[in-house]
From Swiss-Prot:
Superkingdom: Eukaryota
Protein name, UniProt field: Endochitinase 2
Function description: Defense against chitin-containing fungal pathogens.
Hydrolase found in the keyword field: yes
Chitin-binding type-1 domain span: 1-42
Family matches, as PROSITE patterns: CHIT_BIND_I_1 (PS00026), CHIT_BIND_I_2 (PS50941), CHITINASE_19_1 (PS00773), CHITINASE_19_2 (PS00774)
Gene Ontology molecular-function annotations: chitin binding; chitinase activity; endochitinase activity
Substrates-to-products reaction catalysed: Random endo-hydrolysis of N-acetyl-beta-D-glucosaminide (1->4)-beta-linkages in chitin and chitodextrins
Propeptide: 296-302
GO biological process: cell wall macromolecule catabolic process; chitin catabolic process; defense response to fungus; polysaccharide catabolic process
Enzyme class of the recorded protein, top EC level: hydrolase
Length: 302
């Protein structure tokens, strides 16, 4: 096997599709979803990020992440449009699958979920409202531990800590190891790259977004409509929509417990970004009545 869950989440080179069996190719056998695991499209590798720059310009990016470079934000100056676009080149299916509304909705959903993970504004005056303060942080504040777990495949490097870093706040040595293997960077020995190199930092978030972790689908497949809930998903209240993405990311802490401020914050960012991009929200935005997925990579276990 060359890619996907059979190869630690590795991506195929050159934008090739990863089949359900973990092999790289460009024909329908490899690229047809839902069997395809990553870099999927209906007829071979998806186009590169030229389409992405047409959907979200530098000006729009700056409007969406309005206060990321504010003096109150510890990560000011770190997250750039150029790094976002450069990182997307390693994940050519991102925001290139489906019609224009679907592609815009994926951009909104990705930036919304990562904005929640990196949000500022709490505890100080937040001009323009709380949903204009995404991407304020690039590393976890006051981590409670080194996030080092015993793992024969991805052992902790001496003296290194694996607390939350980057847009998706990737945590734990086994997640750094899988991600690093997929993007071709030794993150086990160099975890600080996620808070010092903005392109690698964005790549870590795209890796999480595009990679399914059984029994969870990828966030990408959910937002483009390639995931169909099984009978057990339906019994658990999980239906296609933005709410399932929240479940994938942090369902253990936020889903199936009724209304809570964390889920509302994720929805608030999403609605603001959809409005800026001029696209509808879709259905099933929350996960209040969804049971969490089983074990798998998620921010709450990261």
């Amino acid at each position: 096997e060359q890619c996907g869950r059979q190869a630690g989440g590795a991506l195929c080179p050159g934008g090739l599709c990863c089949s359900q069996f973990g092999w790289c190719g460009s024909t329908a056998d490899y690229c047809t979803v839902p069997g395809c695991q990553s870099q999927c499209s209906g007829s071979g590798p998806a186009p590169g990020p030229g389409g992405l720059t047409n959907l979200i310009s530098r000006e729009t990016f700056n409007q969406m992440l309005l206060h990321r470079n504010d003096g109150a934000c510890p990560a000011r100056g770190f997250y750039t449009y150029d790094a976002f676009i450069a990182a997307a080149r390693s994940f050519p299916a991102f925001a290139t699958t489906g019609d224009q509304a679907t592609r815009k909705r994926e951009i909104a959903a990705f930036l919304a979920q990562t904005s929640h993970e990196t949000t500022g504004g709490a505890g100080w005056a937040a001009p323009d409202g709380p949903y204009a303060w995404g991407y304020c942080y690039n590393r976890e504040l006051n981590p409670p531990s080194s996030y080092c777990a015993s793992d024969p495949n991805y052992p902790c490097a001496p003296g290194k800590q694996y607390f939350g870093r980057g847009p998706m706040q990737l945590s734990w040595n086994y997640n750094y190891g899988q991600c690093g293997r997929a993007i071709g960077v030794d993150l086990l020995n160099n975890p600080d790259l996620l808070s010092s190199d903005p392109t690698i930092s964005f790549k870590s978030a795209f890796w999480f977004w595009m990679t399914p972790q059984s029994p969870k689908p990828s966030c990408h497949n959910v937002i483009i409509g390639a995931w169909s809930p099984s009978s057990s998903d339906r019994a658990a209240g999980r239906a296609t929509g933005y709410g399932v993405i929240t479940n994938i990311i942090n369902g253990g802490l936020e889903c199936g417990k009724g209304w809570n401020a964390q889920v509302e914050d994720r929805i608030g960012f999403y609605k603001r970004y959809c409005d800026i991009l001029g696209v509808s929200y879709g259905n099933n935005l929350d996960c209040y009545n969804q049971s969490p997925f089983g074990n798998g990579v998620s921010v709450d276990s990261m």
